[in-house]
Amino acid sequence: MKCSWREGNKIQLLENGEQYYPAVFKAIGEAQERIILETFIWFEDNVGKQLHAALLAAAQRGVKAEVLLDGYGSPDLSDEFVNELTAAGVVFRYYDPRPRLFGMRTNVFRRMHRKIVVIDARIAFIGGLNYSSEHMSSYGPEAKQDYAVRLEGPIVEDILQFELENLPGQSAARRWWRRHHKAEENRQPGEAQVLLVWRDNEEHRDDIERHYLKMLTQAQREVIIANAYFFPGYRFLHALRKAARRGVRIKLIIQGEPDMPIVRVGARLLYNYLVKGGVQVFEYRRRPLHGKVALMDDHWATVGSSNLDPLSLSLNLEANVIIHDRHFNQTLRDNLNGIIAADCQQVDETMLPKRTWWNLTKSVLAFHFLRHFPALVGWLPAHTPRLTQVDPPAQPTMETQDRVETENTGVNP
């Protein structure tokens, strides 16, 4: 499947769970025909229970609902929680589930990391938020800072087609859609141009990274990137410095406190390389950064699930949208500049680690390990990821009057 730019779309930026979850649950509540939901994480907490209730109500009123969860990111949903949905008719699948070894999850690589919702070919959501109370400010200091978009217009048809291509048993649905569906002539609720891009392990291995590189090459005035896990390849780093050196203002927002020590060590090498190359690096300090967004000049932006690290760029299944829209671009710029002013600390040369032989050795080793990590994973025994559907619970046998009389008389019904 290949997608092209679609015009006439309406797009809304959603920040954190306070904006995202009410919008998603409202759309599910208004669904009439079909819901497709993909996510990496679904926890059985307050947010997860609200999603459960919304999907259950939709299925009970006759809406066809399908859910795809990652087997690593969502391993602990209770049988009761899932069975209630499947009993109501929700099709519930896990992406590549694996048994635990000594209580530890073993399926850490090549994950389904996308976060997509499609409602009736009318509305779609795509971004970085999972379904967890961690995305609500009420969660406390560890609440995540994140973004998603709500989409209406022709791009939703592309996102639905993408989902139908990737879910099993959908060949008949795809054929029916192509034969019978005609886009409504005037169904262009907005002015945004939008392109769906994704990363898989087949024909689209580097599509998301390629669009980033093209953006950096074309930038003339300003680029702002906010990304939770920033550890791209040589080409990306070189493109950043090259853009900065030709006068483009580059602002890079990353986590102030990475959750893995090796990432912190490697990042210090990036700080030296980028800051001395003219890139403005900002550490977001208010709370954990989980966003994956960027903008360029006045008209280019992206929002989605893809980090800029080896896992997202080389192993995981990811999805972003690329957006050409001046109003959306300005909205995102205002938001990112706001968190830079209020919640970030700029990295300057006084904060860079001393270039001793020991610090340099540690940074170089960590950097090259992380960059070659996908290749190292490639040496592991290959397997074909599978989708495992959860069967509805068995229904108890009904004690009908005919059955009672048959058992009493010994006569076949």
Curated annotation (Swiss-Prot):
Query: Which SMART domains does the UniProt entry name for this protein?
Result: PLDc
Which Gene Ontology terms describe the biological processes this protein takes part in?
Answer: cardiolipin biosynthetic process
Q: Name one Pfam family in it.
A: PLDc_2
Q: Which SUPFAM superfamilies would you find in this protein's record?
A: Phospholipase D/nuclease
Q: Indicate the residues that form the catalytic site.
A: 113, 115, 120, 290, 292, 297
**What are the PLD phosphodiesterase domain coordinates in residue numbering?**
108-135, 285-312
Q: Where is this region: Disordered?
A: 388-413
The membrane topology term of the UniProt record is: Peripheral membrane protein
Claim: Kinase is one of the keywords in the record: no
Per the UniProt entry, the signal peptide is: none
Q: Which reaction does it catalyse?
A: 2 a 1,2-diacyl-sn-glycero-3-phospho-(1'-sn-glycerol) = a cardiolipin + glycerol
E.C. code: 2.7.8.-
Provide the family line.
Belongs to the phospholipase D family. Cardiolipin synthase subfamily. ClsB sub-subfamily.
Stated name of the protein: Cardiolipin synthase B
Originating organism: Shigella flexneri
Lineage of this protein's species? Bacteria, Pseudomonadati, Pseudomonadota, Gammaproteobacteria, Enterobacterales
Gene this protein is translated from: clsB
